[in-house]
Design a protein with these regions (language model features):
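Long, continuous compositionally biased terminal/linker segments
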Residues: 41-54, 603-605, 609-612
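Extended C-terminal regions of large enzymes
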Residues: 1, 68-612
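Glycine-rich phosphate/pyrophosphate-binding loops
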Residues: 13-46, 126-142, 289-291, 296
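Compact, glycine/acidic-enriched structural inserts
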Residues: 44-48, 60, 154
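Glycine-rich, N-terminal phosphate-binding loop and its surrounding beta-alpha-beta segment
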Residues: 1-29, 49-81, 86
Length: 612
């Protein structure tokens, strides 16, 4: 719904494993129900039913709790239930997400992880599915029929030992999870502020990791799957809601994760952690992607500041930076399908077109500052100085998410991609490697959010080679097939290229769709340039070969822009070549034959689109 193209999104929680153990490798749902329904998959009984659901609540924190109680045989059986749902926003927003539940036996409450990106929640509700429930209570270490349990145990012992000994010295995931990132991003000028204008802010300390250490409940294991030692799925217990339909209620809030902290926090100028938590809760229960919502609000706030829209258009809301109350009201309107919030719920690409058509906005300006690629809002990192992450956003198949190529840390913090060739090669390797996790239902965090003590001494520390070896053991241990790291990448490469071709069939998947809004590459406005004038002037002298002293700010911006766009074009060429694609970003016939995906319709599509 958001990109009009191919989408996949992954989430933690119990649904995926329970579905597999119940006997299903995949679930395909065709058609549209005549009334609201719940699909119930009882793995214990070997039965699937479709049941009418006219009275159950729609928002996820209520619905999942009710269904968990309904379909569990007793209180102990609640941990055997997982629910997929999308809240009321899914009836109105293009970027509605899915909530996947699990039952926290220590808290005795239902919790969630999200498949957030791309609007899959909208698809669920369009089919009039209120929820999918799976039950499976027979789980053991043998449930997935492993071929060699000792190999799996070997990998487990190694990673669990590292987590126990090193996590507190590295990212402290077990206490604050991805909440450790805001101060690092702020320090390196990478924290998005005011719709990605800036990368740091004086009030960023209000969103510091120490704040989340205090707000997250400590002392309770927080893994979103059995046996996860990293246990990073933190939450805020006993949170008092201040707004919306549940005002005054005390709730458990899952998160916030970094993307939410930076999105509905710094990127819209909100540095109140309690406001961030409140928006986190309502985005979750309504079924709203926090990244897309945050960027849509940030874009609207910048357009409000620029005079493109005003209070008459926003229904009286003052969309100024830092107005958390206005942002929350937009969120509640979005969920109801009312007011200006309903427009915000359609995403940045829609807002750009709407503001040009209805309010006479400058098309170039809104294109430059509307932070989306392929219709998907950009994840919450400032990329002006990271050519690698620019490629990570622009060249990603699905749009500008960080699932395929989260390179910002290795590029800008650890400085592991110093050369142009390093960046181009990373954009070939990491999308394939990271796709492999999604294909196999595995979390990426035990791969690179904890690393061996000697990782820096390895030949390729950015790949964490010891952990790559872990996954070859896991694959062989489960399937009985011995594999190398190259074998794992080949699995992904077939899927990755096929997905690019499917996008091509749908009218996308070429070079023209791989460009970024310029703000992701460099400064758009004089305000931005002057905020980092020393840096940009130095780059003009040293990299572009231009003396900036005689130039106006506007001329400096134009010269720098021409240089940075040319660098990005060069990067596209280098990455396409490594991927086996032509200069237009289309997989070649040679590549699809090499991968064994040269089906007749694939060959015909490539010939049709390339003319040869």
């Amino acid at each position: 719904p958001l990109t009009q193209s191919v989408i996949d999104s992954n989430a933690g929680g119990y649904f995926g494993p329970y579905l597999k153990f119940a006997g299903w490798d995949a679930l395909e749902i065709q058609g549209i129900a005549e009334q609201d329904v719940i699909i119930v998959i009882d793995g214990d009984a070997g039965r699937v039913t479709v049941e009418a659901a006219p009275l159950e609540p729609l928002n996820s924190h209520l619905l999942a709790a009710q269904l968990t109680e309904m379909y569990a045989t007793d209180e102990r059986d609640r941990k055997s239930i997982s629910v997929v749902s999308a809240g009321q926003a899914a009836e109105h927003s293009r970027y509605a997400s899915l909530n996947l539940s699990w039952y926290d036996v220590r808290r005795k409450q239902v919790r969630f992880k999200q498949a957030g990106r791309g609007g899959s929640g909208r698809v669920l509700r369009h089919k009039r599915i209120k929820a999918i429930v799976v039950r499976y209570s027979q789980m053991t270490g043998e449930s997935n029929n492993p071929a060699n349990m000792e190999l799996i145990r070997r990998a487990g012992r190694r990673i669990n030992k590292e987590i126990a000994e090193l996590d507190s010295k590295q990212n402290n995931m077990r206490k604050i999870g991805t909440g450790h990132l805001p101060p690092i991003m702020d320090h390196f000028d990478l924290l998005p502020v005011h719709n990605y204008r800036y990368g740091t802010h004086p009030d960023a300390s209000n969103l510091d990791s120490s704040v989340w250490l205090r707000l997250f409940t400590q002392g309770i294991p927080d893994g979103c799957w059995y046996g996860c030692t990293l246990s990073c799925a933190h939450g805020v217990d006993h949170f008092h809601l201040q707004t919306g339909p549940y005002k005054g209620e005390v709730v458990l809030v899952d998160g916030p994760e970094y993307e939410t902290i930076a999105g509905v926090g710094s990127n819209i100028g909100v540095f109140d952690p309690l406001a961030v938590i409140e928006m986190n809760f309502y985005c979750d229960t309504y079924g709203v992607d926090t990244i897309s919502f945050a960027n849509s609000v940030a874009f609207a706030m910048e357009c409000y500041e620029a005079g493109i829209i005003n209070k008459e258009i926003t229904g009286g809301l003052e969309l100024v930076w830092g107005n958390a109350r206005a942002a929350l009201e937009l969120l509640h309107q979005l969920a109801r399908g009312e007011g200006f919030g309903h427009l915000v719920g359609q995403g940045v690409r829609f807002l750009k077109q709407h503001f040009v058509r209805e309010y006479g906005a400058d098309p170039q300006f809104v294109q430059d500052v509307g932070m989306e690629v392929k219709g998907m809002e950009i994840s919450e990192y400032m990329t002006k100085e990271s050519l690698a992450q620019q490629g990570g956003y622009g060249l990603a198949l699905k749009g500008a998410q960080h699932d395929e190529a989260w390179l910002i840390f290795m590029d800008m913090v650890n400085k592991q991609l110093p050369t142009f060739e390093d960046k181009a090669e990373a954009l070939h390797y990491f999308p394939l490697w990271r796709t492999w996790f999604s294909l196999h239902g595995l979390c990426k965090l035990p791969w690179n959010d904890i690393v061996p003590a000697n990782n820096k001494e390895t030949a390729e520390p950015h790949k964490v080679p010891e952990h790559v070896e872990n996954y070859t053991w896991l694959y062989e241990g489960l399937t009985g097939t011995r594999v190398t790291a190259a074998d794992l990448l080949a699995q992904s490469e077939r899927v990755y290229n096929f997905q690019r071709l499917l996008a091509l069939k749908l009218g996308f998947g070429t070079r023209e769709h791989d460009y970024l809004p310029y703000r992701a590459m460099g400064p758009v406005t004089p305000l931005e340039y002057e905020s980092r004038a020393e840096r940009y002037d130095r780059q003009l002298r040293d990299e572009v070969g231009v003396d900036p002293t005689s130039l106006t700010v506007e001329e400096k911006i134009a010269r720098l822009r021409a240089y940075r766009v040319a660098q990005y074009e060069r990067l596209m060429d280098a990455v396409y070549k490594r991927r086996g694609w032509d200069e237009n970003g289309i997989p070649t016939l040679e590549k699809v034959r090499e991968l064994g995906i040269d089906l007749p319709e694939v060959v015909e599509l490539i010939k049709q689109k390339t003319g040869h």
